[in-house]
Amino acid sequence: MYNAPMAQDMSYYEHVQRRHEEKGCLYACIFTALCCFCCYETCECCLDCLCCCCN
């Protein structure tokens, strides 16, 4: 038989979605914006999350 898959870390998008579900849209958008601020660049993932976090 096959072994169970190893635990995987949550992706960035999944993390933002979880924040949106737990704390609301505004928190998720601020979390995403601060992530880009901390890494000093705007990445595609951040833009996608900002556009989609309120859906």
From Swiss-Prot:
Tissue/organ expression: Expressed in roots and shoots.
InterPro entries, per database record: CYSTM1_HM_Tolerance, CYSTM_dom
GO molecular function, one term: metal ion binding
GO cellular component: extracellular region; plant-type cell wall; plasma membrane
Main location: membrane
Induction section of the entry: Down-regulated in root tissues but up-regulated in shoot tissues in response to cadmium (CdCl(2)).
Bilayer-crossing regions: 24-40
Subcellular location: Cell membrane; Secreted, Cell wall
Role description: Confers resistance to heavy metal ions (e.g. cadmium (CdCl(2)) and copper (CuCl(2))) by chelating them at the plasma membrane of root cells, thus stopping their entry and reducing their accumulation. Binds to aluminium (Al).
Similarity comment text for this entry: Belongs to the CYSTM1 family.
Name listed for the protein in its UniProt record: Protein CADMIUM TOLERANCE 1
Organism expressing this protein natively: Oryza sativa subsp. japonica
Encoding gene per record: CDT1
